[in-house]
Amino acid sequence: MKILLIMSFFLAIGCGQKEKIKLAEQKSVTVQKPVQLQNQPKRPDYAIKAPDFTLKTIQGELFKLSENKGKVILLNFWGTWCRPCRREIPDFNKLIKNYQKDGLVIVGITLKRSSYETDSSIADFMNDWDINYTILTDINNYESQVVTANYGQAIGQPITGIPTTLIIDREGYIVKGYVGPRSEEIFYKDLKPYLSSES
């Protein structure tokens, strides 16, 4: 009789725990499920929330990703020393000129190769290349490396090659990624569904 009572006690506890775990799993799925706005293009199933960050523009102003919700963001990890990155600059200039009015924001996160690369030398590079979109750098030291590591973790693979470029939709989800340079035409084809809809 005692054994039956003990077994039924553990069975009741076990069921209760299973129900709690099941309920917790349901809650976490509900919380993490992206909200799809009616006038947005269908977000891919693999889309993930872009990690928020704060970095500094070359002009010295703070840039916080989450303050750009409602915009379509082309996030580019690049370096002034990277030749393939340089190839994309004219295409990014054209894209921002043509589609900023539609809500496009292009943001370059600068990965410095050495301590000799300063905000001043990056500003000179921007002037030489007529860069007309936002370029970000560290606030103090190494924040851009932390952001790069966080994005590598978010997309499931470290960002070791640059340029690496991500499209972030108006609700802040990473919907497309590229490793290596791409043309204006390729970027526009993938950006177009997100630019033509507004939040």
Feature-to-residue mapping (PLM):
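Conserved redox-active cysteine motifs that mediate thiol-disulfide chemistry
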Residues: 69, 77-94
